[in-house]
């Protein structure tokens, strides 16, 4: 199933498709989630349990990392691993073969690290990642749009000789219900403010929030509200997860092909409704002879 997924999963949006592009760049987002698996000894040994406030969680968990096309919400590449694997480690395996020039990749503050940033930059993709507020980014040159240039270094580079220049965008969401949580800092390798103004990148970053719903779609809506994967061995859990990713891709592809001829952004269509329509049509498809 993994080999099939690697052949099938891909970006779908043609150039100019509504909601999929920013100044000629295909907008992508990186995000991860965890899924409960059946509480069997083999699954527990392979995937592991997350910690809990008292003891451990009731179920082992698999960690899933996905690269998502923002305009269509299709997962274009994925990595599946035991719970103990960090998202940064998984991303270091996933990104070199999947990021391409012409992409603009968004990611939240849990992903940034100098080594992963360097790996992602080497792909030729452009990046706009949120970073934690305690990351030291001294101002080196203030740009006309209020962003500024700084240099990031590997923490192991004691002599600070092999840094990379980044552009830093600081902003605060106004009139928010949670003002103490709404200070944002982005770093990007789009260094020219004329090509990507700070205000536009700040607005674009919040497209990333939408893809958090992608994992909800195949964790909940695609599985009829079942919260635990049914497979009882690690190999079958992996097959089940890749199968879910393929099913999600097929549904999202159908939604995109329904929206684009009408000039619509696929975001305007309901994933839940699409699943219901497909379920109604499946008996008809099964009746067609091969």
Located regions from the model:
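Single, function-defining residue in the core of a domain
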Residues: 2-8, 17, 22-26, 30-290
């Amino acid at each position: 199933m993994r080999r099939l997924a690697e052949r099938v999963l891909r970006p779908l949006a043609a150039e100019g498709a509504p909601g999929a592009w920013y100044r000629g760049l295909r907008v992508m987002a990186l995000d991860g989630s965890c899924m409960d698996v059946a509480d069997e000894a083999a699954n527990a040994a392979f995937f592991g349990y997350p910690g809990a406030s008292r003891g451990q969680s009731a179920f082992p968990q698999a960690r899933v990392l996905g690269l998502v096309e923002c305009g269509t919400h299709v997962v274009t590449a994925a990595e599946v691993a035991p719970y103990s694997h960090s998202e940064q480690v998984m991303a270091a395996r996933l990104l070199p073969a999947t990021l391409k020039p012409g992409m603009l990749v968004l990611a939240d503050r849990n992903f940034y690290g100098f080594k992963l940033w360097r790996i992602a930059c080497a792909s030729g993709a452009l990046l706009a990642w949120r970073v934690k507020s305690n990351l030291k980014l001294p101002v080196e040159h203030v740009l006309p749009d209020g962003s500024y240039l700084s240099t990031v270094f590997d923490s192991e580079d004691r002599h600070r000789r092999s840094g990379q220049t980044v552009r830093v965008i600081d902003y605060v969401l106004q009139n928010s219900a949670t003002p103490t949580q709404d200070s944002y800092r982005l770093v990007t390798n789009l260094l020219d403010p004329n090509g990507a103004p700070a205000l536009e990148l700040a607005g674009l970053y919040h497209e990333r929030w939408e893809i958090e719903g992608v994992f909800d779609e195949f964790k909940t809506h695609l599985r009829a509200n079942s919260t635990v994967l049914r497979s009882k061995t690690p190999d079958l859990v992996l097959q089940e997860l890749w199968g879910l990713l393929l099913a999600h891709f097929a549904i999202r592809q159908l939604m995109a092909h329904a929206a684009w001829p009408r000039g619509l952004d696929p975001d305007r269509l309901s994933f839940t409704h699409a699943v219901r329509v497909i379920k109604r049509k499946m008996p008809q498809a099964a009746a067609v002879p091969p």
